[in-house]
Each structure stands twice: as structure tokens, then as C-alpha cells.
Amino acid sequence: MKLKTGVMAAALMAVACGVQAQVVVKHLQPNEKSPIANGVWAGDTLYLSGQLASPVTPADEAKGTAAVYGDTKTQALSALNKIQALLKEQGLDMKDVVKMTVFLAGDPEKGGKLDFPGLQAAYTQFFGTKDQPNKPARSAFQVAALAAPWALIEIEVIAVRGK
């Protein structure tokens, strides 16, 4: 009886302490020269790095001016399209986004104030629509500046692969 009780107690302790599952971590590299991963998988959760806009006309990229990238709405649409493409490469879609963080720089054309309506106009084309009704938890902040001097917006997301 004592042996049975001891074995049972040991088994219960093992279950109570839990067996830690191995979480597979995979880094998505944009290219060999970039010091930043496009994203990181941790189990079924994908953490995408912040995305900036692409130039409206790629041939103008070397100019590096805000006009080449557009206003907040244009930049937000560009960043969201990049996010959508990155998610698609990983077998996900915008419906899988559970958290979004948006960093907005003040728009010089708006007296240094952030263009929240511009963000919303782009955001509502991807979330809360008839075709894609899901909406992630979201935070949006005005920051003093972003890494690229022309950037008005940077968006990062967390997405989860459903079972």
C-alpha cells in the first residue's frame, strides 16, 4: 500500500509540476544583410516586425522624401499591404491578427499632429469589413520620430495560427 501511495504521489507531482512543452522558434529573415528579422514564430504565434511604407513610385525611392511615400493614409495602406503579404507567405491572413501596435509620427502637413483619421481610413479597409469582420486589439501612439525621416507610420502585428 505504501509503495502504491508513493508511486501515485510521484505521478501527481509530475503532473502538477507540468511537463514543459518545447516551443519551436523560427526567425524570418528579410535578407542576409538586415540586422532585424521580418518576424519570429514562437509556437503558433507570429510576431511581425514593424513595417514602413514602400514608395508610391518605386523609381523615386532614392529621393527619400515624404512626398515619395505619401500621406498617413497612403503609408498605412502600404504598410498594411506589406503585412498582409508577409502573413500570406506564412499561411496566415489579416483575420489571424490578434494585436496591432501603430506608431505615428506627426505629419508636417498637419502642423506636426498625427493623422488619426488617415490611419483609420486605411485600417478599416482590412479590419471590420464584410469580408473580414475580425478586429485585433490595437494601440496607437504618436512618437517624436520614426527611424526613416520620411516615415509617418510604422505598424507591427502579432498573429496566431488557429487550430
Describe each region flagged by the PLM:
Residues L3-N81, A85-V98, L104-K163:
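N-terminal presequence-like segments and the immediate start of the first folded domain
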